[in-house]
Amino acid sequence: MKTTIDHIPPQKQRQLSKTLEILHEEFEDALKDATANFKKRGRILKIILFGSYAKATFVDEPFTSKGYRSDFDILVIVNNRKLTDLAEYWHKAEDRLIRDKEIELPVQFIVHSLREVNTSLKEGHHFFSDIRKEGIVLYELNDEPLAEPTQLEPSERLRMASIHFEKRFKVATNFALLSKQALRIDMMNEAAFLLHQSLEQAYSSVLLTLTNYAPASHNLKILRSFAEEQDRRLAEAFPREHHRERAAFNVINEAYVKARYSNHYKISTEALEWLGERTAVLLALVNVVCSDHVSALQQAADKTN
């Protein structure tokens, strides 16, 4: 795997260094005073930068009409699956990465155990194969390489992609319809929750169809970042140029929990209508992106028959 970040501008290299510092500090803090053996022995084995900043295809255009900026996408590999629980061990790191003023770019990170990553590679998951091929090691406890990836036959990739697309896209569409009905009868919080679920399923549809992987997360910012990394056309759905656009997305991102359980969650009819319109745009784009991918896999499978 690659180890140099020389292609990244110095200012962003400093932001990456700060990101590593925060991940290490907060993980160590989460494990201090631990009594369980797996916590005492808990270690970060590797931290890998992947996505556009690893591939040198990043975009940083915050002042254009779309306001698009590539995120830092990071894979943290730990030595025990129990340590991958974001709410238990990583929520403070997540919060600091959002609030730290030295880090201007959004940081989206996922955590997996070494066994999970190696198993995924052996099973031919394209998401992890791509990280192994294109990722940059920012930190490693030792230089033990990741497992060699298995290359799936085109027919098998086609089979899995088709199943994911058919199932997830239908669910995403249904949630959007239910959200619209809830809004029509002024069930605001229910409409927000259902729209969140539509977006979650839409982005997961892209990730599973194209890579056979989606993080176990309800955080729309993570799912959006990873999905847009697969196909930049998806960024057209949710512009970021204006504060009101970013604020609306933040409010719907909170809906998974707060729209159901918080007495203080509020979202306006105007925001929900705009978010519903943008979700419809996203669903149309997801349909195109996934259909294109399935068609390409079908052509590849036909050539091998």
Regions from the PLM with identified roles:
Residues 38-40, 249-250:
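A general structural signal for short secondary-structure junctions and capping/turn motifs
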Residues 44-58:
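Short gly/ser-rich loop at a beta-strand->alpha-helix junction or flexible surface loop bordering the NTP-binding
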Residues 2-34, 41, 58-121:
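Metal-dependent nucleotidyltransferase catalytic core
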Residues 15, 23, 43, 296-305:
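Charged interaction patches that mediate protein-protein contacts
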